[in-house]
Amino acid sequence: MAESKSTSWADEVASPTIEKNEGNPLEEAQLDGATEPLGGGTLQDGQYEVEVKLSDIQGDETSPLYSVETFEQLGIDASILKGLYAMNFKKPSKIQEKALPLLLRNPPTNMIAQSQSGTGKTAAFVITILSRLDFSKPTTPQALCLAPSRELARQIEGVIRSIGQFVDGLTVQAAIPGAVERNAKVNAMVVVGTPGTVMDLIKRRSIDASQMKILCLDEADNMLDQQGLGDQCMRVKSMIRVEQILLFSATFPDEVYGFAQDFSPRANEIKLKRDELTVSGIKQMFMDCPNEVGKYEILVKLYGLMTIGSSIIFVKRRDTASNIAERLTKEGHKVAAVHGAFEGSERDQVLEDFRQGKAKVLITTNVLARGIDVQSVSMVINYDVPMKGRSDSEPDPETYLHRIGRTGRFGRVGVSISFVFDRKSYDALNQIANHYNIDLIKLNQDDWDETEEIVKKVIKSSRAGTNLQS
C-alpha cells in the first residue's frame, strides 16, 4: 500500500506492495451489447495477454480460425450478427478473439475461460448457446446456463434475449425460485437458472433434459467452490447428457481449478496471469478508520461522493447491511439494501430501482459481488474487507476482485475504497494487494478536501478508453 500522510498504527507496518504506474488508460473499449436497462456500456480490452491451452495437442495455433478479428470470420448466423450490431458490438474483444473460434468449432469441445470483469465473457457464451440451437424444436430445452444468484440469472436471460432479438423462434425462460409454477412445464430452448431450482425442476420432470446440448456455468468458481452449490451443479450435470460444457469466471483459485477440470474434462483453457486480473480503470484506495464505529462516520462523510454516480457498499453480514441502510435513511439519504434474507421479488425490485437510479447507493452482501452490471456504478466501498469462511480466518482475494469489478466496467473508470480499522483488517487488505501485485492509495481522513479532490478527479474523469465507433 502507498505511504500515508496521516499518522496511525498502520503507518508503522512495512508494506512490500509494488507501486504501480498510474496514467495508463485502457487501450480500447467497445460496446458490450447489454441493453440500457441492463447497464450496457463498453468492454474492457486493455493491455493484457490471453493465454490459450488447447485440449487437443493436434490443435493448430496458426490456423486462421485460431484467432479472429471480426465476427463475420466466425460464420455466425446473420440473425445473431444483426443482434450484435444492434447492440453496438463492433469487433470481438481479446477474450472473444481467442474463445469464440474454439467455442463454435465442430465437433463441440469443452472450455474453461477466465478473464477480467467486463471483457465480454457473457457475450461469448451467449453467442455459442444461440449457435448450437435446433430451431425446429422451439419448445424443447436444449441449452442450460447456471448462475449462483437469481439476479445474475435474470441478467443473463436479458443478454440472451438482446443478442437473440432477431433470431426467429428463440425462446428463453428463467428457472429461479418463484419463476415456475408447481406443475408448469419449462418449454423454452434456453433455460437460465440457479442450480437448486433447476435440479428440482428436472427431478419433477418440469424440464425435459433429454435433448440438452450445452451446459454453461457463469461465475463457475463460486459455484464449484461452495459445497451446496457445487453438489447441486454436479447433480444437474449427472441428470443431463450434453455435447459441450462451458465454465466462465473472472477468477479460478488454484484450489478450485482441479475441480473445474474434472467438471469440464478435456477442456480448452483460456486464462490470464494473476497480476493481469485487475482492471486498470479501477483506482483502488483505502481508508484507515479509527475503529469499527468510526467506519460508519467515515461512510457518512463519503456520501456526497457516492452519489456523483451510483455506489455499492459491500458488507459481510446481513444485519450490517440492514443497519447501515436504516441509519442512512433516518439521516435523510436515499439508499437501498438487498441481501439473501430478502424474498426473490423484493431483490428483483431493489436491483431494478437501483438500475433506474431511484436509489443511488446500494448496501449489500456478497450476493451481488459477482457478475451484476450496472453502468452508472462509479464507486465500490468495501465496508468490510472480504474474508473467507465464518471464522474470517484468511483474506478472500477472489471476492475482493469480484466486488471491485462492479465499477470500472465497460471501459469506464471507477473507484474502490476499502475500510481498515485494526491490524487484522489492514494485514488482510495488504495480503490481497500483494496477491494481485497492486498498490492501494491511502486516502487521508484528516484532510477531507484532499480526499474529495482525489476521488472526484477519478469519478468525473472521462472514460478509461475510447469507443470503437468506426
Swiss-Prot record:
Transmembrane segments: none
Biological function: ATP-dependent RNA helicase associated with the nuclear pore complex and essential for mRNA export from the nucleus. May participate in a terminal step of mRNA export through the removal of proteins that accompany mRNA through the nucleopore complex. May also be involved in early transcription.
Single annotated GO MF: ATP binding
InterPro entries, A to Z: DEAD/DEAH_box_helicase_dom, Helicase_ATP-bd, Helicase_C-like, P-loop_NTPase, RNA_helicase_DEAD_Q_motif
Segments forming domain Helicase C-terminal: 281-459
Residue span of motif DEAD box: 218-221
Oligomeric and partner information: Associates with the nuclear pore complex.
Native source organism of the sequence: Botryotinia fuckeliana (strain B05.10)
Biological process according to GO: poly(A)+ mRNA export from nucleus; protein transport; translational termination; tRNA export from nucleus
Gene designation per UniProt: dbp5
Lineage: Eukaryota, Fungi, Dikarya, Ascomycota, Pezizomycotina
UniProt subcellular location: Cytoplasm; Nucleus, Nuclear pore complex; Nucleus membrane
Ranges where the record places region Disordered: 1-43
Comment field on protein domains: The Q motif is unique to and characteristic of the DEAD box family of RNA helicases and controls ATP binding and hydrolysis.
Annotated EC: 3.6.4.13
Coarse class of the protein's main subcellular location: cytoplasm
GO cellular component, one term: nuclear pore cytoplasmic filaments
Catalysed reactions, as listed in the record: ATP + H2O = ADP + phosphate + H(+)
Topology of the protein relative to the lipid bilayer: Peripheral membrane protein
Protein name from the UniProt record: ATP-dependent RNA helicase dbp5
Key words, A-Z: ATP-binding, Cytoplasm, Helicase, Hydrolase, Membrane, mRNA transport, Nuclear pore complex, Nucleotide-binding, Nucleus, Protein transport, RNA-binding, Translocation, Transport
Record-annotated Helicase ATP-binding domain positions: 102-270
Family of the protein in this entry: Belongs to the DEAD box helicase family. DDX19/DBP5 subfamily.
